[in-house]
Amino acid sequence: KLFLSKSSIASTSEGSNGIFSTDKATVYANDVKITTKKGGNSRGLDATYSGVIYANKMNISTEGDHSASVATDRGGGYISVTNSTFKTSGSGSPLIYSTGDIEVDAVKGTATGSQIAGIEGQNRILIYNSSLTSTNDAISGSDPIKNGVIIYQSTSGDAETASSKLGDFEAVDSTLKTTISGGAMFYVTNTNAKVVLQNTKLDFDSSKVDLINASGNNSNSWGSQGSNGGKVTFTGIKEILKGNITVDTISNVNLYLTKNSKWTGSATIENNSAGTTSKSPLTVNVDKSSKWVVTKSTTVSNLNVEKGGKVVDSKGKTVTIKVNGKTKVKGSSEVVVTATGKYSDTIKTSSKSSLSTRVL
């Protein structure tokens, strides 16, 4: 074990992490300033092969490429950070990058050369009471599209250890902001994912940027074309969501609006001719207290709306819902939602729609 307090760490070379824990070692850090300059692959906190880091009152700044403020890498690891400040400026240097398990609480951070956060493989990021911003308006690293948060699986082997069965991103009582002018706030490709947001503000230009993009890719050998789609269960709890959803036919988005949540947007199911069409690319679930404000006529695979839940247009008028060519709900709006599969008045939730137990 290592205990470090009221200290300053600086590095100027390639591959020089500020604090590094590996092989089941544990580090406790409090009131430490970490600065990594010039050299790439120089993270502030890095844990691999079941290494553990507990950190509080950290001030972390990195300048190089592939230098996240906080990262878990090959072999997985666990990092918790509280009451801290993050800053990154390099390409491919998100504030948080997880191939393990990372929790942050009461953290403020700004990334100027990368997205907010990234999860590779079946790993996890949990965010509480934090404000994280990306001011980068370029594609981060070698990503296929611009994004605020990416959940994916590469072929690097870095994400060989899983801390959960899904790539799991959760944010509670927080603010996530990106200034990208295209792409998606959440981008999922070549993996299965879970996103849960509770009382968290998403700040992005929803007129230009999708809320969610789940699709296959032809970049970086991230899976085989036609079978490398993204699958995500995306849940809002007491959430105000804006922005459209794009999902291709080899992918799957299962959206849940719960506990007084509201989503304003529409959806597009794009054809991916390289693979077999998913049975249900897009399912929208609206509980009895929530609302979907449909901004234009939209086709979904399945639509489940509990009694009391609302599906309306921007003027508050009930939209028409058609299921397999038959009118299920006759609305007063010109907007039409078409379900090619099933329509019901019940929704079924699972652990994929629930917040994880906090470790912090």
Segments (PLM) and residue ranges:
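Long, low-complexity, polar and repeat-rich extracellular regions
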Residues: 1-360
